[in-house]
């Protein structure tokens, strides 16, 4: 049989007391402080949405590729139309872009169907008993590529706006992270381990008196290697004493 108090709580109409999680929205997503940076906070428009603010500042609110529709902004003629990369031009638009010219064709004498289009470069010349095209006498396959193909231009990086430039300067001026230095007590503890066990890291890990926190063999090796590096480098005071000794 269950506890009577637990059964009463289950029957009670009072809501269950639950701890509030800080930094978490009702949807369960993590709450992000968008105004954590001073530069962004100064240029933030509270009337606009997060996406609108990020687009205006020249930033990306989502690193993933767009997976749906985008917001249509208002223009003078109405709503903005987003150009689709998969849109196929109609026949009228295609004829406007294409250049109209005349060319020679070879037809089948029986059916009258066009067999091939004769271009100026396709004129055949007989060389060493073989008929080859005058434009490609060596039958080079690379020469068959069309010269009219558009060249792939390298992507030109857009000039960043002032806010992005300020953020980049702020990121470049961040002070480098200082390396962690071992304390005096840690150095004394390492010296006692080395005096007792030498280079036997497995014995150091099993020593319950000198290693009460049960540091692993790999962790002890890293600490001792770091200690050896700093002990071999002379301190500033030692360097000063050496310089004075040389001068005297």
From Swiss-Prot:
Does the keyword section mention rRNA processing? yes
- Which portions of the sequence form the region Disordered? 1-27
Q: What cellular component GO annotations does this protein have?
A: nucleolus; ribonucleoprotein complex
Localization per record: Nucleus, Nucleolus
Q: Which UniProt keywords apply?
A: Nucleus, Ribonucleoprotein, Ribosome biogenesis, rRNA processing
Q: TM spans, by residue?
A: none
Q: Is Zinc-finger a UniProt keyword of this protein? A: no
**What's a BP term from Gene Ontology annotated to this protein?**
rRNA processing
Assembly information from the UniProt record: Component of the pre-66S ribosomal particle.
The task this protein performs is described as:
Involved in the biogenesis of the 60S ribosomal subunit.
The record's family statement is: Belongs to the NOP16 family.
Q: What is this protein called?
A: Nucleolar protein 16
């Amino acid at each position: 049989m269950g506890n009577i108090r637990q059964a009463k709580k289950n029957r009670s109409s009072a809501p269950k007391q639950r701890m509030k999680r800080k930094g978490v929205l009702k949807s369960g997503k993590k709450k992000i402080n968008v105004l954590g940076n001073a530069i962004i906070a100064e240029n933030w428009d509270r009337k606009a949405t997060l996406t609108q603010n990020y687009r205006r500042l020249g930033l990306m609110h989502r690193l993933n590729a767009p997976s749906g529709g985008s917001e249509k902004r208002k223009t003078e003629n109405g709503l903005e139309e987003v150009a689709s990369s998969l849109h196929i031009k109609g026949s009228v638009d295609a004829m406007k872009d294409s250049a109209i010219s005349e060319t020679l064709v070879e037809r089948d004498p029986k059916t009258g169907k066009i067999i091939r289009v004769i271009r100026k470069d396709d004129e055949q010349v007989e060389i060493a008993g073989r008929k080859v095209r005058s434009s490609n006498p060596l039958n080079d396959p690379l020469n068959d590529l069309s010269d009219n193909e558009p060249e792939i231009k390298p992507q030109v990086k857009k000039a960043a706006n002032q806010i992005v430039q300020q953020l980049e300067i702020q990121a470049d001026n961040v002070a480098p992270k200082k390396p962690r230095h071992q304390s005096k007590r840690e150095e004394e503890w390492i010296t006692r381990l080395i005096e007792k066990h030498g280079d036997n890291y497995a014995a150091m890990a099993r020593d319950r008196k000198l290693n009460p926190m049960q540091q692993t063999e790999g962790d002890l090796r890293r600490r001792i290697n770091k200690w050896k590096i700093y002990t071999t480098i002379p301190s500033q005071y030692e360097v000063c004493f050496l310089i004075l000794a040389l001068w005297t």
